[in-house]
From Swiss-Prot:
InterPro entries: Phage_P22_Orf201_C, Phage_regulatory_Rha
Pfam families, per database record: ORF11CD3 (PF10549), Phage_pRha (PF09669)
Protein name: Uncharacterized protein HI_1412
Superkingdom in the source lineage: Bacteria
């Protein structure tokens, strides 16, 4: 499998539900030409045996997938930092090439997410402000209409009285 460009590596990265860019142990196995169970072994050796503590909690998440026989199998999702920690130990020329390209892919995705995220957040904030202003105006209009409904008959009757009093009666018979 030839995976030497950022575009190809994008398929191995995703944004998880916490808005973090991650990859997983199955993808790492594919990229480095290793068996997935060996990648799991390497991760466990790093995370559990080396007692990485908080770093492990922040950068590795144990999940699962279903294999071609429908069996539930272990898998790890990892951040860029988790990926780097894992593959720093892989020393082959192929591994070095993939590490460099993978780092570029993470950076590319982060930049893309930041650009789109800022633009979307800016538009969202503008819409929130507009929504709040229009909601307040509509509420004010609604309150005004409700008050007008009660005030209108009284004001119109009072105006009629004043109009009648202001009308000069001519002494014509």
């Amino acid at each position: 499998m030839n995976l030497q460009t950022i575009e190809n590596f994008e398929q191995f990265l995703k944004v998880n539900d916490k808005q973090r860019i991650v990859t997983n142990s199955r993808h790492i196995a594919t990229v480095f030409g290793k068996r997935h169970d060996n990648i799991i072994r390497d991760i466990k050796a790093l995370v559990i045996e080396q007692d990485c503590g908080e770093f492990a909690l922040l950068n590795f998440e144990e999940t699962s997938y279903f294999d071609e026989w429908g069996r539930k199998q272990p898998m790890y999702q990892m951040t860029k930092n988790g990926f780097l920690l894992l593959v720093m130990g892989y020393r082959t020329q192929k591994a070095m090439k993939f590490k460099v390209e993978f780092i570029k892919a993470f950076d590319f995705m982060r930049e893309k997410l930041q650009q789109e995220g800022y633009s979307l957040m800016h538009k969202y904030n503008e819409l929130c402000i507009e929504h709040k202003a229009k909601k307040a105006f509509a509420s004010l209009c609604g309150k005004g209409l409700r008050e007008w409904k009660g005030d209108k008959p009284v004001l119109e009757a009072t105006l009629k009285l004043f109009e009648d009093k202001m009308q000069i009666e001519l002494p014509i018979k």
